[in-house]
């Protein structure tokens, strides 16, 4: 079956209709076979609320991760009987009735390790195995071992894992890559989608959809067999993201799908629940109370949906960058998400062809082509000269430049002339001494200036290289690696995020202290080390001078700073 010509839109519409009906069936099948564990705020009701509001623990995630020692209903009944008694001690009650998460052992690396040796030594430290969990544990079991980010993040996270897996592959740990792909496929088969992380309280949302890219990565080692093996799960994930599309009218939205007035289909981030997040309970309640002009449930949904984006939180989602309570994630069509959906459609087409289903391959290709046109039409700001998010309320592309603008280049969805403009905008507005800024706005949120994040550095580097912008790509990698190296030289750690306004300093902002470990930084650092150093002369540390330079970029001086405690 040949893909219909672009000049005949009436037939193009028939193909998506057919394919979406198939996906609707897949989605229903996933829901019917799934077992959905209840999150702790539902299991424990008023007890959960009271413990979190009492701020018994510095990190609210601690109690969200605590395991009840008996049936939650029995614990709740005991609490109701005891809570008004004289001398009742809530902390003692929690200690008796729950097993609190243990602090991970402090990893002390051997003296004299290079950056590469340190990362290679961290893989077993960050590996977890949870084939079985306690009945009421919020942790969801997975059949294979997996690598966690580190620090307070004791579970596997969806989009983090892709960049971690890049590093595992670079280290030759293809068995771990295969294990993690198998785990995510298991989650799709069990829950109908890949949750934010393997916790019951993350099941109501997903994260940036990298599963198809993970399968594509595994196919580099296993060939088309990997594509064919995981085609059913990729189709199910696509069904999850497109759930509800068959009933949409022009100008409507349903869950994660948006249908614009001209019929263009795009996606947004969404969480199925509209309550405070268990892992950030008190903070979310305070945010909602701080804006009485909006329904609390609306704010909760937008907070949760921002967590689904991975960018929690950023001025990108807010009307007022200084007020988190003005975020409205669900009314924004993100450029990075739709780039990933385009890539998913392209990989689904490739996998279908590998499986011998050329008709289905053509249908996915048609969907990818339509989405690419939508990206170019709605997610490009011609006045500013960069890709940006689309605002469903104003019906306009937004003006803000963020590092997400590089995603169309990363997935090869950008027009060549626009890629050139993106290179100029990136170098002019986002490139800093220590890497790529997330945005140019200083809001105090962690996904804003001056923070830089490893996954965004890699997306920008690869995206610019895809379009021949090698000098800007090399500048980004070199600046970020220098930052990582300077921090490592002083702290002997790799950080979750970095201050890119200088070098040698971890990032700030956000709802929790800076975390070290750190899965995706490890992965991106290895990829960048192998990018800037020739294969015949691999480097274990960042070189003192910028390799392969055709620009005037000079080695960066290390910032004098005190070690973080």
UniProtKB/Swiss-Prot annotation:
Residues annotated as binding substrate: 152, 159-160, 196, 205-207, 277-279, 310, 511
Region described as Disordered: 538-565
EC primary class: hydrolase
GO biological process: cellular hyperosmotic response; trehalose catabolic process
Pfam family, one: Trehalase
Catalytic activity, EC: 3.2.1.28
Subunit: Monomer.
UniProt protein name: Periplasmic trehalase
Organism: Escherichia coli O127:H6 (strain E2348/69 / EPEC)
Gene that this sequence comes from: treA
């Amino acid at each position: 079956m040949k893909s219909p010509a672009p000049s005949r839109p009436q037939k193009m519409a028939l193909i998506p209709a057919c394919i979406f009906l198939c996906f609707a069936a897949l989605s229903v099948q996933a829901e019917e076979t799934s077992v959905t564990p209840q999150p702790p705020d539902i299991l424990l009701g008023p007890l959960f609320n009271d413990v979190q509001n009492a701020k018994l623990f510095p990190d609210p995630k601690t109690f969200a991760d605590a395991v009840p020692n008996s049936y939650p209903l029995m614990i709740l009944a005991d609490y109701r009987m005891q809570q008004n008694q004289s001398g009742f001690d809530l902390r003692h009650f929690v200690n008796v009735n729950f097993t609190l998460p243990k602090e991970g052992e402090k990893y002390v690396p051997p003296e004299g390790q290079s950056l590469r040796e340190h990362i290679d030594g961290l893989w077993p430290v960050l590996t977890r195995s949870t084939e079985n969990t306690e009945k009421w544990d919020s942790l969801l079991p997975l059949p294979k071992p997996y690598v966690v980010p580190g620090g307070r993040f004791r579970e596997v996270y969806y989009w983090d894992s892709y960049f971690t897996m890049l590093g595992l592959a670079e280290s030759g740990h293809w068995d771990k890559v295969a294990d993690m792909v198998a785990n995510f496929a298991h989650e799709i088969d069990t829950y109908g989608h890949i949750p934010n992380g393997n916790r019951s309280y993350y099941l109501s949302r997903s994260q940036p959809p990298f599963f198809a890219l993970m399968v594509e990565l595994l196919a580099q080692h296993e060939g088309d067999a990997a594509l064919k093996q995981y085609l059913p799960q990729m189709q199910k994930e696509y069904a999850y993201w497109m759930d509800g599309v068959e009933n949409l009218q022009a100008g409507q939205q349903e869950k994660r799908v948006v249908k614009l007035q001209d019929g263009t289909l795009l996606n947004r981030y969404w969480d199925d629940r509209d309550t405070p997040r268990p892992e950030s309970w008190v903070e979310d309640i305070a945010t909602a109370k701080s804006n009485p002009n909006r329904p609390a449930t609306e704010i909760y949904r937008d907070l949760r949906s921002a967590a689904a984006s991975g960018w929690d939180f950023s001025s990108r989602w807010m009307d007022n960058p200084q007020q988190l309570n003005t975020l409205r994630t669900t009314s924004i069509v993100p450029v990075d998400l739709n780039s990933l959906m385009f890539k998913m459609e392209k990989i689904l087409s490739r996998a279908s062809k590998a499986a011998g289903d050329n008709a289905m391959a053509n249908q996915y290709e048609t969907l990818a082509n339509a989405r690419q046109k939508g990206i170019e039409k709605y997610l490009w700001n011609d006045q500013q000269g960069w890709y940006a998010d689309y605002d469903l309320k104003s019906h306009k592309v937004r003006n803000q430049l963020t590092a997400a603008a590089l995603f169309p280049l990363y997935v090869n969805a950008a027009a060549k002339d626009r890629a050139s403009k993106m290179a100029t905008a990136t170098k002019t507005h986002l490139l800093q001494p220590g890497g790529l800024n997330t945005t140019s706005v200083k809001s105090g949120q962690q996904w804003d200036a001056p923070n830089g994040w490893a996954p965004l550095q890699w997306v920008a580097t690869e995206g610019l290289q895809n379009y021949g912008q090698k000098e800007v790509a090399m500048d980004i990698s070199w600046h970020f690696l220098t930052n990582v190296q300077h921090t490592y030289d002083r702290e002997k750690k790799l950080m979750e995020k970095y201050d890119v306004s200088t070098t040698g300093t971890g990032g700030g902002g956000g709802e929790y202290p800076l975390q070290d470990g750190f899965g995706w930084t490890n992965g991106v650092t290895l990829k960048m080390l192998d990018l800037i150093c020739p294969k015949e002369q691999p480097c274990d540390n960042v070189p003192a001078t910028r390799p392969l330079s055709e620009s005037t970029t000079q080695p960066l001086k290390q910032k004098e700073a005190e070690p973080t405690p």
